[in-house]
Amino acid sequence: MLIHLIRHTTPLIDDGICYGQTDLDVTDSFEAERDIILSKLKSNYDAVFTSPLIRCARLAESIQAPKRFSDKRLMEYHFGDWELKPWNSFKTQDQRSWMNNFVEQAAPNGESLIIMRDRVLDFWLELEKANYKNVAVVTHSGVQRLIHAHVLDTPMNKIFRLGLSFGAIMEVNSSLEDELLTIRHL
């Protein structure tokens, strides 16, 4: 199965603000960004899966496929009480503690990276068993990084070493018969 993991376009929010699962719209550059992304994609997808957040759903609407699915498991990391707060304001003991152990520790009223990984891999393992040839998945950088880490068996505390710009496309070629997974970045 050929799977394109596509990061959403630029969200409508100031730089330096923590936004995770906040449902943000996209900027005025959406159409131009969308057209660039679409020029890199296939035209014969069997299905499109998307995070339900607007910044993903808008892009997913532009990708042609006979089947469409919105799936909460594809949502970004939930930063809880820190959503919509400036990153540079994270000076409390809770925030310092979280930054030192973001894999296991949840943001207040949010989720840990382990919880996020479990929901993302639940989706991923289900998708790998599905009977599709070509699939597009419109999602967030956190989801892309976790799938990348899973496929390459990378420790979760290293996932932020992978830089992903808005509109980044990862292509995963999955063959369960050969137990072979390859990734390339488009």
PLM features: what roles do these ranges have?
Residues I3-P66:
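Active-site-proximal alpha-helix that buttresses catalytic centers in soluble enzyme cores
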Residues I63-R119:
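Phosphate-handling substructures
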Residues T182-L186:
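Short, solvent-exposed aromatic-acidic interface loops
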Residues P155-L180:
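Domain-level recognition of soluble alpha/beta enzyme cores
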Residues I3-H4, N131-S141:
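Generic beta-sheet signal
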Residues L41-N44, L127-K133:
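Glycine-rich phosphate-binding loop signature in dinucleotide/nucleotide-binding domains
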Residues S141-R145, A168:
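GST superfamily/GST-like fold recognition
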Residues T50-S51, D118, V138-T139:
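Short beta-strand scaffold positions
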